Amino acid sequence: MDIAQAKEILKEDLPFHAIVDFADQVVQEMNLSKNGKILDVGTGEGNMAITLALNGYRVITGEPEDDYSDYSKKDWAGKANKLHVDQLITFKPFNAENMPFENGMFDTIFLFCCLHHMQEAVRADVMKECIRTTTRAGIICFFEPTKAALELIRKAAPDHPDAADPVLYTQGFNLSEERRNSDLFIAYIFKKRD
């Protein structure tokens, strides 16, 4: 199934429509190996994991087991099932600041609009864990909302936190950085350097 078909099936799902084209564009530009190991931190509504699965990637995704926020209660599995990509997505509960994965396990890690929901005190630890669990040539990709996106979000959720800048947590690590921008999101793509 392609992105256009998925959008038609999920035509009532406004968050999916808001992110899928840009997320898909970024994934396409990254030219990831179809056999690569991919982690999606912060499942939420499942939009990032589903976008990856629609592109044929197998994905591990997860949230903290003790997360009772509105985002963690979303039926991402039902959405993935509707799109027939549920078999490509494995859910595993975990905390991003202390991941239960081996060193160098993942080729690519995605964090779609979740860093700004994490406490400031753990964000540096989250970055360290992403670096620890990616391969030597690993890629870590954060998506964060723009001011325009926050204005839209805050119409329904006035207390929604400000976007986070993942660059602040890269100090001391040998990473290259690229950015991709859309009206609603910024993708920060960090690549490990030897």
Predicted feature locations:
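Class I SAM-dependent methyltransferase Rossmann-like catalytic core
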Residues: 2-21
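Conserved alpha-helix/loop element of class I SAM-dependent methyltransferases that forms part
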Residues: 16-35
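Conserved Class I S-adenosyl-L-methionine
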Residues: 152-175
